[in-house]
Curated annotation (Swiss-Prot):
EC number: 7.1.2.2
Recorded catalytic activity of this chain's protein: ATP + H2O + 4 H(+)(in) = ADP + phosphate + 5 H(+)(out)
The gene coding this protein: atpA
UniProt name for this protein: ATP synthase subunit alpha
Species: Amoebophilus asiaticus (strain 5a2)
Bilayer topology: Peripheral membrane protein
Pfam families (alphabetical): ATP-synt_ab, ATP-synt_ab_C, ATP-synt_ab_N
Record's subunit section: F-type ATPases have 2 components, CF(1) - the catalytic core - and CF(0) - the membrane proton channel. CF(1) has five subunits: alpha(3), beta(3), gamma(1), delta(1), epsilon(1). CF(0) has three main subunits: a(1), b(2) and c(9-12). The alpha and beta chains form an alternating ring which encloses part of the gamma chain. CF(1) is attached to CF(0) by a central stalk formed by the gamma and epsilon chains, while a peripheral stalk is formed by the delta and b chains.
GO annotations of cellular component type: plasma membrane; proton-transporting ATP synthase complex
Residues the record lists as binding ATP: G171, D172, R173, Q174, T175, G176, K177, T178
Function: Produces ATP from ADP in the presence of a proton gradient across the membrane. The alpha chain is a regulatory subunit.
Top-rank taxon: Bacteria
Family: Belongs to the ATPase alpha/beta chains family.
Length: 532
């Protein structure tokens, strides 16, 4: 028999005990009382927080929205398969969050930030950020001062948008709302090529999967997916995922905003999000209000849209921002921005309905698209009279301000006079001239699908239009004149175009544009007189 030395035994025991973990961890576990329609009522989670994630025994997750006296109402992310009465659910002690990073650029993700485009997992460094977060306080913001060029003449000239602004796109179905948003994303290609990208996030809420696929195909065709992320919550997904999809988009945008970069988020559309929220609220037995929406539907949209902001350029101030996620510590930079373009669908042009009026009052202006204009072939079908940008004027570049200063007023006046002229009364020469110029301006402001124009192209053509160089040419020749004029300037005056692109404006630039417009217009007038 081998002699055992006491010190050897002690050494072996010490070695074994060194790896022994005696810490006990308490898990708060509840029992599902009832489940149905994507909502689970759980008993036993007495210390749970509002908005906390709950995990079921099969790994599926839900978010606690209703904290009642004897139970918790939790909305399940996705379907409720495998969850039944008596199933266990445990607290995660984590607020709903997603993992965000630059690897998301060019990807299609779902509401939970998981890739759904079949290209494998998201690569690169990822940061955990909460879906719900307080908007930056007043101290950490600065006024909107930098333009966000949409590439759409009617918007950049009359309803300018600045970086950090919230501008509503509102109109009936099939009036070109999504097209307007997609064209804005396509126009950011210029900045991407210059090395100063505006990162775009397109959030599709409650749309057909085929529509989302079509949007993605358009973005890929024009090379816009290189700086764009799509968050997809199609019509077939659960109401809970449609409700949270805009918050996912805002969180991705906030990552770029807080790291000092410009971002643009498009919510297409918030009407469907409100419907999804109404469904969730009614299933949770919350008392319905106007149009059966819950009482806090205004707060739903205000807390989402307030997250769009232009952040103070001072790094030290930006780093003290309220509610910064711990994962971004040491990475926060000032000067970033998040611009929001929410979309709202109206019924028969009724902008005074509940959800439209709510969102109009939250945003910094609205672009109203009209069915009558769209059907008349005026596209984009923007009603200039009731469209407005409350803060974007401060961000408009000098050259655009100079050429389009009175355009909005002139077009509103033209619409009024045109309506009056339909009564058939004799019009004086001045009124006829105003109507004629208004029609030509209207023709100039028309734009083709997925055909955004650069700043310098817009300034040049609007200068010719607003200064009367199109007065003598016929309405049918306006589009042809525009193409010829821009082609001429690109071939013979590249230096002038470069100055306008940099935001410069001078009498010398105006003189070059005036001479070329006058000479070209004369050719069209002579051509018309010869043919007649």
């Amino acid at each position: 028999m081998v002699d055992l030395q006491p010190d050897e035994v002690a050494a072996v025991l010490k070695q074994q005990l060194a790896h022994l973990k005696t810490d006990t961890e308490l898990e708060e576990v509840g029992t599902v009382l009832q489940v149905g329609d994507g909502v689970a009522h759980i008993y036993g989670l007495t210390k749970i927080q509002a908005g906390e994630l709950v995990e079921f025994e099969n790994g599926k997750k839900a978010i606690a929205l209703n904290l009642e006296e004897n139970s918790v109402g939790a909305v399940i992310f996705g379907d409720a398969e495998g969850i039944g009465e008596g199933s266990t659910a445990k607290r995660t002690k984590r607020i709903a969050s997603i993992h965000v990073g630059e690897g998301m650029i060019g990807r299609v993700v779902n509401t939970l930030g998981e890739p759904i485009d079949g290209k494998g997992p998201i690569k690169g460094e990822l940061y955990e950020m909460p879906l719900e977060r307080k908007a930056p306080g007043v101290l950490y913001r600065q006024p909107v001062a930098e333009p966000l060029q949409t590439g759409i003449k009617a918007i950049d000239a009359m309803i300018p948008i600045g970086r950090g602004q919230r501008e509503l796109i509102i109109g009936d179905r099939q009036t070109g709302k999504t097209t307007l948003a997609i064209d804005t994303i396509l126009n950011q290609r210029t900045y991407f090529e210059q090395g100063n990208p505006v990162y775009c996030i397109y959030v599709a809420i409650g749309q057909k999967a085929s529509t989302i696929a079509s949007v993605m195909a358009s973005l890929e065709k024009y090379g816009a997916m290189e700086y764009t992320t799509i968050v997809a919550a199609p019509a077939a997904t659960a109401a809970s995922l449609q409700y949270f999809a805009p918050f996912t988009g805002a969180t991705i945008g906030e990552y770029f905003r807080d790291t000092g970069k410009p971002a643009l988020v498009i919510y297409d559309d918030l009407s469907k999000q409100a419907v999804a929220y109404r469904e969730v609220s009614l299933l949770l037995r919350r008392p319905p209000g106007r149009e059966a929406y819950p009482g806090d539907v205004f707060y739903l949209h205000s807390r989402l849209l307030e997250r769009a902001a232009k952040i103070n350029a001072n790094d030290d101030i930006a780093q003290q921002m309220n509610d910064l996620p711990p994962s971004l510590e040491g990475k926060v930079k000032g000067g970033g921005s998040l611009t929001a373009l929410p979309i709202i669908e109206t019924q028969n042009g009724d902008v005074s309905a509940y959800i439209p009026t709510n969102v109009i009052s939250i945003t910094d202006g609205q672009i109203f698209l009209e069915s009558a204009l769209f059907n008349a072939g005026i596209r984009p079908a923007i009603n200039v009279g009731i469209s407005v940008s409350r803060v974007g004027g401060a961000a408009q570049v000098k050259a655009m301000k100079k050429v389009a200063g009175t355009l909005k007023l002139d077009q509103a006046q033209f619409r009024e006079l045109e309506a009056f002229s339909k009564f058939g009364s004799d019009l004086d020469v001045a009124t006829q001239r105003t109507i004629d110029r208004g029609r030509k301006n209207q023709e100039i402001l028309k734009q083709g699908l997925h055909h955004p124009l650069t700043l310098e192209e817009q300034v040049c053509i609007l200068y010719a239009s607003t200064n009367g160089y199109l007065d003598k040419i016929s309405l049918s020749q306006v589009t042809e004149f525009e193409k010829s004029y821009l082609s001429l300037l690109k071939s013979q005056h590249k230096g002038v175009l470069a100055k306008i692109a940099a935001g410069e404006w001078s009498d010398g630039i105006a003189q070059v544009l005036a001479e070329e417009a006058k000479n070209l217009a004369q050719l069209y007038v002579n051509d018309t007189s010869i043919n007649s």
